[in-house]
Amino acid sequence: MLDIDVFIEKIKKKSRLIGIDPGGKRIGVAISDENKIVATPFSTIVKNKYSVFIKDIKKIVEENHIKGIVIGNPINMDGSPSQSSQSAKDLAINLSKDITENIILWDERLSSQGAFNLSGDLGSNTSKKVKKLDENSAQFILQGFLDYLSKKNTWSDTVKGL
């Protein structure tokens, strides 16, 4: 895992990122555009063996020219680590060994609720919403990082101009 400033420096060029919502049974995946402005839901991977998961993620990374991974870190509302935080950290460590070192953990507070609320376009069909919830949560996590990145870049450009 990288410090956020180091991560940002390594992904500066036009490149795509993936966002991962690590869940107990399923893992949501979202992908950004090359300019790192918009996150789009991509897929949901059913948790099986780690080797199968790594194969699936490697394929996504290679086929989509991914340069960095943003993993949702499920922390409590008060900022303290949740029970699932260690699982997210372990996943980040393993992915950094198996795929790329360009990985950060990103605060995912309220991502599942936000994703569920934003899925209103699926109508009142709750089973459809639940089916898409993981990849929508990954989109919510990745979009949060992209928005942060955009604000950071805007602020940096403003300061340079002074």
Locate each region found by the language model.
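Phosphate- and other anionic-substrate recognition elements at nucleic-acid/protein interfaces
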Residues: 1-18, 25, 30-162
